[in-house]
């Protein structure tokens, strides 16, 4: 069993509860909603930022893309937003926005590309399916593709590394538990069903806690917690800072000579 400190784990749970924790007591929620109904109508709750920042995406040591992201809680749901901008002269811009409920249920996912081509994707749940609608500049009517997947399936879209951070938090909360003053994670990798909207495909991925590593981040040596993310045809290494809310700090994709580093 892999261990992480219980003290640091508490912070991860606080962050994660906004994303996939079980709903609170229904009677208490009903009473609270009744008492505060008029106040809520008059003034929506202010958004609380869980994490925000940017990742630099490097290929063969050269920065090629910057991802700017935020994770916010507001009005009972969490919203994960991200923007990709290319550093090359040929502009490439993409945005994504994902809203999920406290029980992990997907409300809506949107992806848009404004340059060099105009296209968009929307994913929403419908009964036992996730429905993806794809719009391109070449088509006047959106194409629709259903996926037989639970509405709690995670979105892992191409190049949006903040989605990987949310998946890590889900893994830490679901597959680790306190024991003997420490948090222990299951030894075998945990499997998750995910949807990759840009590729119009679903897949199974595996996450596994490896342990502590000493690595260089921006020229300084850091001791970070390493996890492996793998699936059919890929194997990534991810490092999170267990002393700072389990934030994703670095990703290594050796097969593509790619590295992702938090700015």
Question: What is the predicted role of each segment?
Answer:
Residues 2-11:
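Bacterial N-terminal signal peptides that target proteins for export
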Residues 15-23:
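Hydrophobic h-region of N-terminal signal peptides that target proteins for export
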Residues 23-49:
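Compositionally biased, proline/threonine/alanine/serine-rich low-complexity intrinsically disordered stretches
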Residues 39-70:
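Hydrophobic, proline/glycine-rich low-complexity stretches
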Residues 47-50, 64, 116-222:
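Solvent-exposed helix/loop surface patches that form functional interfaces
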Residues 50-51, 93-94, 208-209, 232-234:
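Short, small/polar residue-rich loop motifs at catalytic or cofactor-binding pockets
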Residues 58-138, 244-251:
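N-terminal mature ectodomain segment of secretory-pathway/periplasmic proteins
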Residues 232-263:
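C-terminal structured interaction module
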């Amino acid at each position: 069993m892999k261990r992480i400190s219980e003290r640091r784990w508490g912070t991860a749970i606080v962050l994660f509860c906004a994303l996939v924790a079980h709903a609170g007591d229904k009677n208490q929620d009903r009473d609270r909603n009744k008492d505060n109904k008029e106040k809520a109508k008059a003034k929506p709750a202010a958004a609380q930022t869980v994490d925000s920042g940017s990742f630099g995406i490097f290929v063969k040591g050269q920065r090629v893309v910057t991802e700017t992201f935020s994770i916010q809680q507001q009005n009972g749901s969490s919203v994960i937003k991200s923007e990709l901008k290319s550093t090359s002269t040929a502009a490439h811009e993409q945005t994504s926005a994902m809203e999920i409920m406290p029980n992990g249920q997907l409300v809506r996912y949107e992806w848009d590309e404004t340059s060099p081509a105009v296209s968009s994707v929307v994913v929403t749940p419908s009964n036992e399916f996730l429905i993806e609608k794809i719009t391109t500049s070449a088509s006047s009517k959106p194409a629709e593709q259903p996926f037989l997947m639970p509405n709690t399936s995670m979105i892992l879209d191409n190049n949006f590394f903040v989605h990987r951070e949310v998946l890590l938090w889900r893994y830490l909360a679901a597959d680790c538990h306190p024991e003997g003053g420490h948090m222990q994670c299951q030894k075998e990798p945990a499997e998750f069903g995910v949807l990759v909207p840009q590729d119009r495909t679903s897949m199974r991925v595996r996450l596994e806690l490896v342990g502590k590593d000493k690595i260089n981040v921006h020229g300084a040596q850091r001791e970070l917690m390493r996890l492996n993310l793998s699936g059919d045809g890929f194997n990534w290494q991810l490092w999170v800072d267990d002393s700072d809310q389990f934030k994703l700090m670095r990703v290594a994709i050796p097969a593509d000579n790619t590295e992702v580093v938090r700015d």
